[in-house]
């Protein structure tokens, strides 16, 4: 019986046709070539046929069957549909649907979308919404969906190439960095970070986009907006921002380029921000990872720069360093500048101990150091040129150790004193020259105006020269000889009377007629001449009837112009600056007809005199001068003493006098006495004040002038016996504890350091290093060593691995100790004093103790040694310098020459090398013998002995006893430390005479620093690996959960198929089709098979990415590496690319990026996977769920053969 409604039996397919069909399916879903070959070779024909049927049935059920709504769904899911929508301001629903399709559809769909210029349209939509001045929630949502779609496109290689084809696309993406929405901002930064490392063109494109952002947003500084992300309270944004900063720095292959970008962020203050974020690192491990990575990369780049600059040159070899710089600059623009710098430095060298040369070199070193670190050095330049190298004129010699520092300091102080004296003399000469110039100018003006005698009279009244009481007036006789005048004093009243008599005397008529025929100028000149002659004679005016000198013989006098003014002014008038016409100039002008005497009688002369009379200041000056204060000593010194006196509030001069005499420490505390020591009055100042007082006593009471406050104070305390010695003794006493307790702990620290160096763990590490070194140097001249010089431990960091980046012999030593002898890793925790003492100076501390001992000996000698009374020594022999430090070299007036001091220093050095532990004591004995030898010369200028009840003797006796005990203990400690140093140097094979204690300890400190940093590097590397492993395990766990849920769904469907109704349906189908039994089995594996195929696409391994042509998911993998800080892996991947050399950035329609890398900023955090789930918290996931639910409903529809759910599907789509 023929089955009318039965299906004909299908023809069996050949294996070749099955392979072709299976290969086409693999091509359609985008399986990579390597996996495609693997599947084709390993999978049997039956399994291939099952996969083909499973894929075909799903495709057939989705795309072929259904009503009109299903056909409509096919259209709305096509790339053409989305491209058309993007051209016409798409809605947020369309953009969401496009994002879902880009994530779910096969690569063939994506390629078709890209071929229709979908990227450009997406960028256009992004720009249109970004440029809006006011953005609403929908605009922000659209921007987020566009960015998410672009990220999905860039997740494949051909999609990435389509995006970076136009550099303006990256420009447009970077402009969204200022969006207020946090997740969108984070996504932009993540895209930029991944782009830096995913392609060789990525870093130039991103830097170009930063430049474009800076220009468009009009930012003043590069990267400023990106940098602000570190200050955002969001931890995710902070970590992502820091990740982008590290990516921008570390992605470049050139260390110079990396340092340039890093310096840009240093100028923005990233170092300070890293310190401010310290509390956040504990709660934000991603941020802590990025911080550690930044510091590590910075340290590595600095080391690499040094190595590149010097090659194998040592830092301690200046000749090799100069040669290396010359080799690098030869033939370039820097050569001439470098040569000029060397020439200037050579010309500036005068003497290594001169403070100016040393100051200049220290200044140059400081400025260049700040330039290399990207720090500002303008303040240092201003301070150096404005303040002589420092705010207080001091010189930084802290790094100079030992007696050399003492000699330098002494010479500096001597030069300062000499400079001060020279400046004072020059200032006095300048003042004197100025006074003389003013007097000459005034006298010339007075002579021209005919008032020479009046000017001299005023000078006599105003000024009284100091030697006026001793000088004798002289008169000049007609013969030119000078004879003394009478010694009777001339009072001011007599001079005024004579002056008025001289100026008001009238000439006889004959003289008047004679003068009336002279010209006005001649008349004035003759008057001046007569007055000058009178003033230069004996001072007695001419009698009233005496005629003036006759005119020159043979001369004809010109007619004079008649006097046009009726009377002269009674007072001196201001001048009217007109240009006068003479009679001969007004002949043909209207002035010829003017009545010159018309207003002589009616002119208000008194009113004019009151309004325009010249101001008279003589009386006011006399009032100011009378009883005014006078500064006798140097003005600046007097001002400083006045400032010092202002410290004594509510303390009178008598109280200060008593405090100095009795050494009262309650009034003269440490800070006050340190200032007081600088202004001890000198003998010249005291003599000048005494002379001034004697001069003023000879003047009348009303004409005496007062001393200034500073001079009164000096005059008061100058009567204290042994004033200078008392102030110096109190200064020494108050400063003794501070100096002793500053030097003694440093010496004790050296003592402890040398004891700690005898640690057995140190020797164990040295043994291990020796074994490693002999193995590495086997067969070379350096091999087969029985030991090594101790500073060789710092050269371990120069031996680097050729496999692991930045991995040195120090890293290997740490890993070896961790695996074999972990207890040795804490060796440096057992020697803390070694690290601390390496930054101190043993010679400087011991020299300080020597100075204190010498000061005690001198003080004891002055107080207790009874000597005959003699002339008081001059203040120039002071034993304490202006900085408050004892100058033991001035204890005698017969100071040693430099040659003697040098020979003495050589003898002391020879004694130190010969002695064994007693060098300090021997030098101290020598110093004592010097003091005793010079005592005979001191006796000539010594003072009378102190009385037993003198406070100076009473108070200092107890101090001397206590201080001697303290100094003895310290000197014993110094001797013990010297012995320890020599023994430890001998133990390590070093010569103690050729190395300083602090230099020896610095070797271990430097190795300790490298050991700690290398250990930190390994910890960071381990942390990166742990995080990567954790992410991988988490990813595998999620995949297993997905597979488990899929299997459960399959089992549930199988159970459903195995139900009675389903069994009947299967039997009916079996009767109608013999092949349906196979299809039912195939259908059970539909989901499993599709999941298996897509697994090869969605989870490619990093190793496959380099060989893949269409790899998918690579952006996520790169972001994970960036978050973990695994830039070593990123650089390794870049080296495996075909073109590892980075090309220059191509900036379309933009100016070429300058070398200085002045780029703007952006921000960063990690949310790639989070954003996939919740892009904007705007029900985006709900839209995606609706799409998935729609697909599941279609699947159930096909399995059950039920067409009644079409309406439900339409509602789901809507």
Curated annotation (Swiss-Prot):
Q: Where is the composition biased (Basic and acidic residues)?
A: 868-877
* Gene name per UniProt: forD
Record-given protein name: Formin-D
Q: Which organism is it from?
A: Dictyostelium discoideum
| Domain spans labelled FH2 | 562-1037
Sequence ranges assigned to domain DAD in this UniProt record:
1065-1095
The GBD/FH3 domain sits at: 10-379
Q: Assembly and interactions?
A: Interacts (via GBD/FH3 domain) with activated Rho-GTPases.
What note about domains is in the entry? Answer: The DAD domain regulates activation via by an autoinhibitory interaction with the GBD/FH3 domain. This autoinhibition is released upon competitive binding of an activated GTPase. The release of DAD allows the FH2 domain to then nucleate and elongate nonbranched actin filaments.
């Amino acid at each position: 019986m023929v089955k009318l409604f039965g299906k004909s039996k299908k023809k069996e397919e050949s294996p070749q046709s099955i392979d072709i069909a299976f290969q086409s399916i693999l091509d359609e879903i985008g399986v990579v070539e390597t996996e495609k070959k693997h599947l084709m070779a390993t999978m049997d024909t039956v399994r291939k046929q099952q996969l083909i049927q499973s894929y075909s049935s799903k495709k057939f059920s989705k795309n072929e069957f259904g009503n009109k709504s299903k056909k409509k769904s096919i259209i709305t899911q096509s790339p053409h549909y989305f491209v058309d929508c993007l051209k016409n301001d798409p809605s947020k629903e369309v953009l969401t649907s496009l994002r879902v399709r880009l994530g779910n559809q096969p690569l063939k769909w994506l390629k078709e979308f890209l071929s229709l210029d979908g990227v450009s349209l997406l960028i256009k939509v992004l720009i249109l919404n970004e440029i809006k001045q006011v953005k609403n929630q929908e605009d922000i949502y659209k921007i987020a969906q566009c960015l998410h779609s672009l990220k999905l496109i860039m997740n494949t290689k051909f999609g990435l190439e389509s995006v970076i084809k136009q550099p303006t696309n990256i420009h447009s993406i970077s402009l969204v960095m200022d969006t207020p929405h946090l997740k969108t901002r984070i996504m932009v930064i993540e895209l930029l970070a991944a782009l830096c490392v995913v392609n060789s063109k990525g870093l130039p494109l991103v830097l170009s986009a930063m430049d474009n952002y800076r220009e468009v947003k009009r930012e003043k500084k590069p990267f400023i907006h990106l940098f602000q992300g570190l200050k955002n309270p969001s931890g995710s944004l902070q970590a992502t921002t820091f990740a982008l900063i590290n990516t921008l720095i570390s992605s470049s292959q050139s260390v110079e380029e990396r340092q340039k970008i890093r310096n840009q962020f240093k100028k923005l203050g990233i170092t300070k921000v890293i310190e401010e974020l310290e509390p956040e690192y504990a709660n934000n491990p991603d941020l802590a990872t990025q911080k550690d990575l930044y510091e590590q990369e910075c340290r590595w780049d600095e080391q690499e720069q040094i190595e590149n600059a010097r090659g194998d040159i040592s830092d301690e070899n200046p000749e090799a360093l100069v040669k290396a710089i010359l080799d690098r600059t030869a033939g370039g623009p820097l050569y001439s500048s470098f040569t000029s710098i060397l020439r200037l430095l050579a010309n500036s060298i005068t003497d290594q101990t001169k403070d100016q040369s040393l100051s200049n070199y220290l200044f140059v070193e400081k400025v260049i150091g700040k330039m290399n670190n990207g720090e500002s050095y303008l303040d240092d330049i201003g301070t150096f040129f404005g303040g002589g190298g420092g705010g207080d004129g001091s010189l930084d010699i802290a790094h100079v150790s030992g007696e050399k520092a003492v000699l330098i300091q002494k010479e500096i102080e001597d030069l300062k004193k000499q400079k001060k004296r020279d400046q004072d003399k020059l200032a006095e000469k300048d003042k004197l020259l100025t006074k003389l110039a003013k007097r000459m100018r005034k006298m010339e003006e007075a002579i021209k105006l005919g008032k020479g005698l009046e000017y001299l009279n005023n000078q006599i009244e105003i000024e009284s020269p100091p030697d006026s009481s001793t000088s004798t007036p002289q008169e000049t006789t007609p013969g030119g000889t000078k004879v003394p005048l009478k010694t009777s004093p001339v009072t001011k009243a007599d001079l005024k009377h004579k002056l008025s008599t001289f100026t008001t005397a009238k000439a006889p008529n004959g003289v008047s007629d004679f003068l009336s025929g002279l010209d006005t100028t001649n008349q004035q000149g003759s008057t001046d001449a007569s007055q000058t002659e009178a003033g230069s004679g004996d001072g007695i005016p001419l009698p009233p009837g005496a005629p003036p000198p006759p005119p020159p013989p043979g001369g004809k006098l010109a007619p004079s112009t008649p006097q046009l003014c009726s009377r002269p002014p009674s007072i001196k008038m201001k001048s009217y600056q007109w240009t006068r016409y003479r009679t001969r100039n007004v002949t043909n002008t209207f002035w010829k007809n003017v009545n010159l005497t018309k207003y002589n009688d009616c002119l208000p002369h008194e009113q004019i005199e009151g309004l325009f009379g010249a101001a008279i200041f003589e009386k006011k000056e006399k009032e100011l001068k009378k009883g005014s204060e006078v500064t006798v000593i140097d003005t600046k010194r007097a001002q400083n003493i006045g400032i010092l006196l202002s410290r004594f509030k509510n303390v009178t001069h008598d109280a200060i006098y008593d405090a100095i005499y009795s050494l009262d420490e309650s009034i003269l505390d440490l800070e006050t006495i340190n200032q007081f020591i600088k202004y001890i009055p000198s003998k010249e100042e005291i003599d000048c004040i005494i002379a001034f007082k004697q001069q003023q006593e000879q003047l009348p009471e009303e004409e005496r002038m007062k001393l200034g406050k500073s001079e009164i104070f000096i005059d008061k305390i100058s009567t204290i016996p042994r004033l200078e010695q008392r102030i110096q003794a109190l200064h020494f006493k108050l400063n003794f504890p501070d100096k002793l307790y500053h030097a003694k702990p440093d010496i004790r620290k050296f003592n402890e350091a040398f004891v700690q160096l005898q640690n057995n763990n140190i020797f164990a590490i040295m043994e291990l290093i020796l074994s490693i070194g002999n193995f590495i140097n086997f067969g070379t001249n350096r091999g087969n060593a029985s030991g090594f010089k101790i500073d060789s431990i710092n050269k371990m960091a120069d031996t680097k691995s050729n496999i692991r980046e930045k991995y040195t012999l120090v890293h290997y030593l740490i890993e070896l100790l961790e695996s074999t002898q972990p207890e040795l890793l804490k060796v440096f925790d057992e020697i803390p004093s070694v690290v601390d003492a390496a930054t101190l100076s043993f010679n400087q501390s011991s020299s300080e103790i020597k100075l204190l001992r010498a000061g005690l000996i001198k003080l004891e000698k002055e107080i207790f040694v009874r000597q005959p009374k003699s002339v008081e020594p001059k203040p120039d022999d002071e034993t304490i310098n202006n900085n408050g430090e004892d100058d033991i070299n001035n204890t005698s007036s017969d100071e040693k020459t430099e040659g003697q001091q040098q020979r003495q220093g050589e003898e002391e050095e020879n004694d130190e090398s010969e002695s064994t532990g007693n060098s300090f004591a021997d030098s101290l004995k020598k110093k004592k013998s010097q003091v005793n030898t010079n005592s005979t010369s001191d006796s000539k200028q010594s003072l009378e002995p102190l009385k037993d009840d003198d406070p100076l003797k009473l108070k200092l006796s107890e101090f001397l006893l206590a201080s001697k005990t303290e100094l003895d203990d310290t000197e014993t400690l110094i001797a013990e430390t010297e012995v320890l140093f020599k023994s430890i140097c001998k133990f390590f094979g070093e010569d103690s005479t050729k190395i300083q204690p602090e230099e020896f300890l610095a070797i271990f400190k430097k190795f300790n620093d490298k050991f700690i940093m290398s250990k930190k590097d390994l910890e960071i590397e381990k942390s990166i690996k742990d995080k990567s492993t954790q992410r991988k395990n988490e990813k595998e766990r999620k995949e297993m959960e997905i597979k488990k849920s899929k299997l459960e769904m399959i089992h549930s469907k199988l159970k459903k198929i195995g139900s009675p109704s389903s069994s009947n349906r299967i039997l009916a189908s079996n009767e109608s089709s013999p092949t349906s039994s196979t299809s039912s089995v195939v259908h059970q594996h539909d989901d499993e098979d599709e999941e298996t195929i897509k697994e090869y696409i969605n989870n490619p391994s990093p190793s496959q990415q380099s060989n893949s042509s269409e790899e998918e998911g690579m952006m996520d993998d790169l972001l994970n590496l960036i978050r973990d800080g695994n830039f070593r892996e990123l650089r390794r991947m870049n080296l495996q690319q075909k073109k590892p050399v980075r090309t220059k950035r191509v900036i379309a329609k933009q100016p070429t990026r300058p070398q200085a890398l002045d780029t703007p900023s952006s921000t960063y955090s990690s949310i790639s996977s989070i954003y996939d789930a919740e892009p904007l918290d705007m029900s985006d996931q709900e839209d995606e769920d609706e799409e998935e639910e729609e697909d599941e409903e279609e699947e159930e529809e096909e399995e059950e053969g039920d067409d009644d759910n079409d309406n439900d599907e339409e509602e789901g789509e809507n």
